[in-house]
């Protein structure tokens, strides 16, 4: 299987006419399916996709790695553009998120159409050769910057972790 990954938005910019922001959004094209990995902090990924000639209406899955605003800030914008993609994420995506003491989570989660969400709790194959891993243990906390990020769950602060996808290609 051949996979093409196109950066729609991230911190640096190398394409003429494109813009960057603190955030991430990648388009993953397997040839059979299109997956959007995160939505950046705003609708900027949509503008960059238009410049690159990418039709986001053709995306089959939106995979949200975690609930921080720089990865989910464009969620509402994407759902307005694409009416078919299944949104894949951990159930904890909507728990309150913080960076230090500042709120940093999904904006207006109550306004979202919950029927489009697929919550994953274990390793799941989304489409042929593409997997999501919702629970990855942190083996070396000193090698991360997670000490600044936490979620509020079960009545207490907890470390905030991510969802990862991989393929056999």
PLM regions with names:
Residues 18-19, 33-61, 151-153:
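Pre-active-site segment of Zn-dependent metallo-hydrolases
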Residues 28, 38, 49, 66, ...:
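Divalent metal-coordination and catalytic microenvironments
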Residues 85-102, 106-155:
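Flexible, acidic/histidine-containing loops and adjacent segments that form or flank the divalent-metal
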């Amino acid at each position: 299987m051949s996979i093409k990954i196109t950066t729609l938005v991230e911190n640096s910019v190398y394409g003429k006419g494109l813009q960057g922001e603190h955030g991430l959004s990648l388009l993953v094209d397997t040839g059979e399916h299109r997956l959007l990995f995160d939505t950046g902090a705003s609708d900027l990924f949509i503008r960059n996709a238009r410049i690159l000639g990418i039709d986001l209406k053709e995306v089959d899955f939106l995979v949200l790695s975690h609930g921080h605003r720089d990865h989910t800030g464009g969620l509402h914008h994407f759902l307005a553009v694409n009416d078919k993609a299944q949104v894949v994420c951990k159930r904890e995506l909507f728990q309150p998120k913080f960076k230090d003491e500042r709120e940093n989570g999904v904006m207006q989660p109550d306004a979202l159409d919950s029927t489009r969400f697929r919550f994953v709790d274990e390793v799941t194959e989304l489409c042929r050769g593409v997997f999501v891993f919702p629970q990855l243990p942190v083996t070396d906390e000193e090698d991360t910057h997670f000490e600044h990020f936490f979620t509020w769950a079960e009545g207490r602060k907890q470390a905030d972790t991510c969802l990862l996808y991989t393929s056999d290609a």
